[in-house]
Amino acid sequence: KSLVNIWIPDGLKDVPADRLSPRIRLRDSLDEVLACGYDKALVDVAVESKVFGIGVESYTVGSNEFYQNYAATRGICCLLDNGHYHPTETVSDKIPALLAFYDRLALHVTRGVRWDSDHVVLFEDELCEIAKEIVRNDAIDKVRIGLDYFDASINRLSAWITGQRALQKALLFALIQPNEALRSLQERGEFSELMVRMEEARTLPLGALWREYLRREGVTEDYFAEVRAYEAKILSERNECLTAK
């Protein structure tokens, strides 16, 4: 099943005089797009919000509230990009909030540095929390995960593999958490022990499990020699062709 995601960067650089009319136009335009018809058994449609962007610092038409209400009333998906919110907000907290009302969600997993910079995804705390919320809420089949990052200053193949593996590690780490035991402690109000057990879980043997996963998949943990070889043979030839032109 494919996912068609709609993100529209309409907005204004400075304070608007009318915040409603552009949103009415966007609502009606999206209705016209969806009215063209599509096979819902084969396609999921999602809408993606953003808090602000370059050139639209003061007002974004497709805000979080707009798209959550639009998706809920049209029976489509919300797509959450963890670089599209205020730095004090976390997508890991938004996932269970939306799962209380939506039967499916979509994600753009990225790594923002101070803003929506789309740095290469790394195995960091928020990525682990996103994975935990998906796993502990039995939402693996409900959440469509896409990666959203780029960095032209580094080898693109290495960036691709690093980000993919970071997400896989986070999901594996979430799968080995004692989720039921932790949930039980919370429900019983045993918050001191809950804190202790969650802290202990940070040192679960992810490394050994990750290496075993790679072994079963027939790939190695250290892939960088292959990246170097690809860089020397394929990318260098491509660069020579571009230079010649």
Label each region the model flagged.
Residues 73-77, 99-105:
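Glycine-enriched alpha-helix->loop->beta-strand junction motifs that scaffold or abut catalytic
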